[in-house]
């Protein structure tokens, strides 16, 4: 149980808040590169700030205040140029660093005045990696953008899924340190949703949480596993400060503001060895719905089930009403680490998992369950005969578009569908 003050300290992310200042020390995924194949600008809201993400005519990305500092026009309606974004209202232009480089009438009427030198727009660095676009909103110099090894994995079909959820980001991230929910939400509840009354999934017998350089792992033993199983020896990674890596996909929980978050999923499906070599030219990005046509929460897919649990806690979970147990040890570890990191940045120190040395920021390995299967692959026959459901259907989020399913089928060269976990 937390006090109301502690809860606010951990949840709220606006400029100047303790958690907001901490999260601004890290890079966050805010969109996908392929989204800009057909458009040049997109409005985004991040940690309570209204911004516009754009790709200029030179192919460079930028992120700046959504409102022009001249008369507050919407820069999302701006015109991209070779080296920046131009306001469509009066033509003022800004580069990726926020400098005003042109004021057409001012430059003509008073060329020596150089009024443009006195005007700037708020701007943040943007980088592309793994098909994602990443933003850094903290003090400079920016740390390294973590180059996780999975971003360079070969012979896999990748897709990026974005969903906007009406709840605070921390509810999503605390899920990254909660192994017991797999037993009940994804196994037992899924059976009930299928109309089954049993048997239930295997019980958890033992759990552990281990800190490492880039976050924590949760490790578990179920009735059907032992201490030699990768679920215990390797575990799954809670990546600091707001992500999870399961062994074949990333889940990022990006704060839009205090009451809204963006789930950004990056998924890798290893193609059969029969389909190698496979080179994916563009990583599709699609937006996953969270409600059906009747306005009911979607519960058929794994992450949609998670979303229901997070949203159900309220816009900002009232942690003063909690009663934590043994299964929640990881939640406590996470909260204490956030508070320690807030203290560190108040002293001018880097928080946990910041990378400054480019020499070590090269294909950084992560805890990966069933690593051999991911790296070496399986034959199409082995996949068809085996129980690896995630290689035969996209079970993680509802709403995979038909054209993305077709791309996945073409890559895998075996039958694919996008039915959910509940339909299994």
UniProtKB/Swiss-Prot annotation:
Q: What class of enzyme is it?
A: oxidoreductase
Q: Which InterPro entries match?
A: Cholesterol_7-desaturase (IPR050584), LigXa_C (IPR045623), Rieske_2Fe-2S (IPR017941), Rieske_2Fe-2S_sf (IPR036922), Ring-hydroxy_dOase_2Fe2S_BS (IPR015881)
Disulfide connectivity for this sequence is none
Q: Name one GO molecular function term.
A: monooxygenase activity
pH behavior:
Optimum pH is 6.0.
Q: Which residues are in the Rieske domain?
A: 27-135
Changes seen on gene knockout: Mutant can degrade syringate and vanillate, but not DDVA. It lacks DDVA O demethylation activity. It cannot grow on minimal medium containing DDVA.
Instruction: Name the positions where [2Fe-2S] cluster binds.
Output: 68, 70, 87, 90
Per UniProt, where does Fe cation bind?
A: 181, 186, 306
Catalytic reaction(s) noted: 5,5'-dehydrodivanillate + NADH + O2 + H(+) = 2,2',3-trihydroxy-3'-methoxy-5,5'-dicarboxybiphenyl + formaldehyde + NAD(+) + H2O
Write down the required cofactor(s). Answer: [2Fe-2S] cluster; Fe cation
- What about temperature dependence? Optimum temperature is 25-30 degrees Celsius.
EC number(s) on record? 1.14.13.-
What does the note under cofactor report?
Answer: Binds 1 [2Fe-2S] cluster per subunit. Binds 1 Fe cation.
Q: Name one Pfam family in it.
A: LigXa_C
**Keywords, alphabetical:** 2Fe-2S, Iron, Iron-sulfur, Metal-binding, Monooxygenase, NAD, Oxidoreductase
Q: Which PROSITE patterns match?
A: RIESKE, RING_HYDROXYL_ALPHA
Function statement: Involved in the catabolism of 5,5'-dehydrodivanillate (DDVA), an intermediate in the biodegradation of lignin. Part of a three-component monooxygenase that catalyzes the O-demethylation of DDVA, leading to the formation of 2,2',3-trihydroxy-3'-methoxy-5,5'-dicarboxybiphenyl (OH-DDVA).
Give the UniProt family note: Belongs to the bacterial ring-hydroxylating dioxygenase alpha subunit family.
Subunit text: Homotrimer. The three-component monooxygenase is composed of an oxygenase (LigXa), a ferredoxin (LigXc) and a ferredoxin reductase (LigXd).
Name of the protein in its database record: 5,5'-dehydrodivanillate O-demethylase oxygenase subunit
- Organism of origin is Sphingobium sp. (strain NBRC 103272 / SYK-6)
